[in-house]
C-alpha cells in the first residue's frame, strides 16, 4: 500500500523542531473523504488539542464536496476526532504537560482507502534558530547549483 500525500504543513517544520511523530486516523463523513481524494484539503492553519483523553484536529479546512447530496451541511472547518490508541494519547499528553511541547499536524495522506494524519510533537524554534535553518537551506541550494552546471 502506497502513501499518497494530499496536504503538507510546511510551516510546521520551519516553526517547530519536531521530536517525535505518530500516524493517526481521522473520523470523517463520506463527502469529506471524497474532497480529500480530490486534493481539496488544507492543514496549514490547523492545530491539535487533547480534551478528555481524546485528540481533536481543529481548524483543518476540508472543502465541501460539490456533488454530495448530504442532508447536514458540513462545516469545512469543523473539529474532527483523531483516532489514536489510549497509550499513544497518554504518552503525548504526558510529554506536552511536562516538557511544554506542541502537537502539530505535519501531513495529510491516503494510505490505502483511509485518510491518515501524521502528527508531530514539536518544540517552538526561536528567531535565531529559524535564521540558521534559512542559512543552511541557502547553502544547500548553492551547493546544488555548483553540481548542476
Curated annotation (Swiss-Prot):
SUPFAM superfamilies: Small protein B (SmpB). Its main location: cytoplasm. Keywords: Cytoplasm, RNA-binding. GO terms for molecular function: RNA binding. CDD domains: SmpB. One of its GO terms (cellular component) is cytosol. One of its GO terms (biological process) is trans-translation. It is found in: Cytoplasm. Belongs to the SmpB family. Required for rescue of stalled ribosomes mediated by trans-translation. Binds to transfer-messenger RNA (tmRNA), required for stable association of tmRNA with ribosomes. tmRNA and SmpB together mimic tRNA shape, replacing the anticodon stem-loop with SmpB. tmRNA is encoded by the ssrA gene; the 2 termini fold to resemble tRNA(Ala) and it encodes a 'tag peptide', a short internal open reading frame. During trans-translation Ala-aminoacylated tmRNA acts like a tRNA, entering the A-site of stalled ribosomes, displacing the stalled mRNA. This is SsrA-binding protein.
